């Protein structure tokens, strides 16, 4: 439970600010990779395994596009922890993974250099999964008699 909560909390902080920085530090190469990654989300249909892999690639491109080395290191830790718990996460965050238009909206905001919009759209997308995960944690800890 602590690992899942920690992953969720870090993701909620890291992803939106990385999107903001990616928009501010936008390069043609980074923009192209991000647009491609977002488009790939729409092509994956409803296969959660494939969507999860493509989402992971999208977030990696976003983090790399931020140009922040500390964010990259944090993402690597986050990614390792996520992959260790991927089957559980996939099912919980299916609505987030299936929100292809949200990924495209984030990438477009980055391409347009709109840092505030990129941050806001990322917060909105991540909140979809975070709300589900935190509710599941709360339900689990209630069943267990607290933390």
Q: Which ranges hold each PLM region?
A:
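Hydrophobic, amphipathic alpha-helical faces that serve as interaction scaffolds
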Residues: 1, 10-29, 39, 53-93, ...
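Solenoid-repeat scaffolds in large eukaryotic assemblies
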Residues: 31, 51, 117-119
């Amino acid at each position: 439970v602590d690992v899942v909560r920690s992953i969720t909390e870090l993701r909620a902080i890291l992803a939106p600010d990385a999107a903001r920085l990616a928009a501010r530090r936008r390069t043609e190469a980074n923009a192209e990779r991000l647009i491609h990654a977002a488009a790939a989300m729409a092509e994956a249909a409803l296969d959660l395994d494939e969507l999860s892999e493509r989402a992971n690639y999208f977030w990696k491109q976003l983090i790399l596009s931020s140009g922040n080395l500390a964010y990259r290191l944090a993402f690597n830790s986050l990614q390792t922890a996520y992959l260790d718990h991927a089957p559980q996460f996939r099912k919980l965050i299916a609505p987030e993974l299936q929100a292809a238009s949200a990924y495209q909206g984030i990438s477009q905001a980055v391409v347009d250099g709109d840092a505030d919009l990129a941050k806001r759209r990322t917060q909105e997308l991540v909140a979809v999964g975070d709300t589900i995960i935190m509710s599941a944690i709360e339900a689990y800890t209630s069943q267990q008699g607290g933390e």
